[in-house]
Amino acid sequence: EKLALSSSHWTIEWHRYKEVKPQIIIEEYKKPIIRIPAQSTTFTNPTKVFVIPDAHVSPEQDLERFYWIGKQIKEYNPDYLVCIGDFCSFDSCSTFDKNHTVKGQKKPPILADINATRDALELLYEGMGDINPQKHYCLGNHELRLYKYEDEHKEVVGAFSQQYETLFRKKGWGISEYGDFYFIKGVAFVHVPLNEMGREIGGKMAEASQVSNAATHDIVYG
């Protein structure tokens, strides 16, 4: 067990220099949970806002859901009705599938997208009945497809976008451009916030960090 070198002056004991195996200790790490109590409001008459996000209307869809959305709006009876973008999908103007491809040839005409939006709005108003909240429409990236198409085809500038906007404006909707904030009592509504370069803030982690870090007010976005 021991290997010793003896002399009149010193002794070395081998057992002191045996390899010592490290002990591995695994302990469970529990991330602390910080709970912030919700603030209670002292308002006796709070402002009620009903938000419609990303409806993505297309001609081939069953649009009956908009009647029931309207019924829910009527029941809630909001002060404001806000659409935060992508009400219409506008696959007609999509650049993902080129027109000469098989998928591209299945894209609907622009007027079919506009007519489907008209039908969806009529069902929505039917469900809403006689209530008349203040209405606003924040354009989304799918509506932007239409404006980009017109921008690239000078001969039709305004021909389709004005028809589309009129569907909303004639019923009292205000319209804000893509990326612009619409404020209600200090709360901002937008389809997606844009960064300093004018690009969309996207991705799960980016949305969790950049939007919350850069915001100076509450934001509702789709």
PLM regions with names:
Residues 1-52, 59-60:
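Acidic, histidine-bearing metal-coordination/catalytic regions of metal-dependent phosphoesterases
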Residues 34-35, 64-69, 204-206:
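Short alpha-helical segments and helix-capping/turn motifs at coil-helix boundaries
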Residues 10-33, 113-116, 128-133, 188-221:
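Contiguous hydrophobic segments
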Residues 57-170:
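Core catalytic region of metal-dependent phosphoesterases/phosphodiesterases
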Residues 43-45, 74-77, 129-130, 182-184, ...:
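Flexible, charged surface loops at secondary-structure boundaries
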Residues 51-53, 80-86, 134-140, 189-192, ...:
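Active-site neighborhood of phospho(di)ester-bond hydrolases with catalytic His/Asp-centered motifs
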Residues 30-40, 50, 118-128, 163-183:
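Hydrophobic transmembrane alpha-helix bundles
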Residues 147-222:
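Acidic, His/Gly-enriched loop-helix segments that form or flank divalent-metal centers
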